[in-house]
């Protein structure tokens, strides 16, 4: 949103210093540069493991002001729902995501305030781990 003009200084044929200014330009507007790079998920796709969202390959010629991440899950690979409260770069895989795919939704804001939303590739279906049963066994004798 700046304007520019040119200032030219020169010495004329009579040894006089001359200064000329151009007219101001129109306001220069930001052209949104595309975000380059990918959001990548690292880790084992199994209950009890931790996945990590990697955003370090993302770049924007306008500079990056912020990157926020959120995790989403899907049972069918088409309909995605947010995992409430999961807004950090790490996701602990618990029973709630078993049988689902997960992906990262990254919201990047550049230094001009332009927001870009990117999604990682979805994981494979999160595997279940057979949890060890807990509790006590009670055996009663039933007689006739």
Where are these regions (language model features)?
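Ser/Thr/Pro/Gly-rich low-complexity disordered regions
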Residues: 1-144
